[in-house]
């Protein structure tokens, strides 16, 4: 691709006007998870097509607020983007006052993926189905530990749904991230985890973890043999976390539209989409307008659940 053509196709990233400064995709989480994986696929696609550097910058902390605020307060010049999970927009605003307003200070670009979550237990726990787990939890109220990567995290909300629908009481142990929690899960120090399939697949396949149910409305392409929560007897249980691409508020609509189209083209390429699906990442894209409506609706839905459950910030 010639430089002129690359500039025309990837004008959204403004790679040509500022070739000396790499564009960046900020991920408000540590490397290795689904958001980081998607950001790197996107960055590689943009860089390969344009010939200009695109870097992924991991800025974890503050329940994903630190990296998200960084982007919210960046110049609206089309050089800085945020690839973030749903809780930044749907959950965090209901848990306390942040130094920025994600719904006002960040502009939706496109939905990028749904992340397949799975309910797992360590192989040392003598349950082989969601029904058996519920029965065990009922016989030992408050004795089974579940982990999460923090108050209001998808893992926390997933376990709360399990408690409410299963009619059980579990003991919550929040961690600073998923990695230390999964390490304790493998060691049997916590007994229940509802988390992203891609980070759990190796442990499920080598028999260290047992998958009891997936949390979306349909079975996982990566774990087709595992029933959905509804199929496993947890009727009404559905947790379908998403990831999206955002820009600082004030970025030109034309730039946002072009970036959304570029991201959709890269992530929906058959090879990339299949590789991500094998990791439990279901690529889904949208227009900026569709995504903006979706974000507002999801914020309202989780706000009701959080208020009803009485969840408070740490």
Where on the chain are the PLM-derived regions?
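N-terminal (or domain-start) structured segment
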Residues: 18-105, 143, 167-194, 203, ...
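A ligand-binding cleft/hinge motif common to bilobed small-molecule-binding domains
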Residues: 87-97, 161-165, 192-226
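Hinge/capping helix and adjacent helix->loop/strand transition within the periplasmic-binding protein
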Residues: 73-79, 93-180, 229, 242-275
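Beta->alpha turn/N-cap motifs
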Residues: 83-88, 148, 178, 195-200, ...
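Cleavable N-terminal signal peptides
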Residues: 6-7, 17
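An extracytoplasmic/periplasmic, membrane-proximal ligand-sensing/linker region
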Residues: 164-165, 205, 231, 253-314
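C-terminal lobe and pocket-closing loops
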Residues: 114, 200-268, 297-300
